[in-house]
Amino acid sequence: MTLQQLKYVVTVAECGNITEAAKQLFVSQPTVTSAIHDLEKEMQIVIFIRTNKGVILSEDGERFLGHARQVLEQVDLMEGIYKDDVVSKPHFAVSCQHYSFAVNAFVDVIREFDAYQYDFTIREEQTHEIIEDVTNLKSELGVIYLSSKNTEVLSKMLKHNELEFTELFTATPHVFICDSHPLASKKSITMDDLQDYPYLTYEQGEYNSQYFSEEFVSTLDSRKNIRVRDRATLFNLIIGLKGYTVCSGVISAELNGRNIISKPLDVEEYMRIGIISRKGVVLSRYAREYIEALKAHCM
């Protein structure tokens, strides 16, 4: 077993395709295929299962990938300490719903490690894209929420993709409005209060159902609905149209603006916000630090 073989395994797992991995590694496809075949033979396990669309990790492969990442991280650390002319570039990726605390936690991870160079990725995406990213190891972690309305459907989807959900905290739904909104002076807001105002939600593409919605309240309960793709547009419309959205209530003035405020929504429901990850995969130190940073921002 060589470090080169471990790098091949990690890259193929991230790409989900040997041809694409070979391009990223600047080697031929037969070279990658042969190296992984030799490794599987040596370790007496099947790491990848071949499919019509590419490759997926086997159960043994998932465990092996976690250990391979740890070994490569340790090598990166040693090279950084003992080889002045070689500076390894750490990698970490997370996919999340449009939560400001998820972005703040990402910032904390970068500041904590303060690396000379790095290649980190944060993706604010649609719910099904988050699940696909973590399933295909495009991202190590995903940040989503479960509620009484979506738990059954999403839990089945997570189980099917061999993902696990770890709850970070439970929140009661809140309404985000601008500080000049007619309802801004109320201590809490009811659904009846909101009927005359536009409801801003994030578009979910072909998965545009309440099960994949980022917002706790269904658009079916609102007369005026506007769907958007990004957070900046959503908050601009909240201000410009006196609209609203429904979320966890964890707000960041630095990211959302100081004229966006949060008010409790008067409903007997809750949101379980947490992270999703691949079962059996050992998390990197960056992923572990990110989870701790999330807890710090949400609790």
Task: Please provide the spans of the model-predicted regions.
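Alpha-helical linker/hinge and terminal dimerization helices associated
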Residues: 42-43, 64-86
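Secondary-structure junction motif
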Residues: 102-108, 151, 191, 195-219, ...
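Short helix-boundary/capping micro-motifs
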Residues: 10-28
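Hydrophobic hinge/microswitch elements
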Residues: 135-139, 145, 204-261
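Beta-alpha-beta core module
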Residues: 160-166, 171-172, 233-281
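Central regulatory/effector-binding core of bacterial HTH transcription factors
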Residues: 89-153
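Flexible hinge/capping segments at coil-to-helix
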Residues: 157-173, 177-199
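A short LG(V/I)-centered, amphipathic sequence patch enriched
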Residues: 40-57
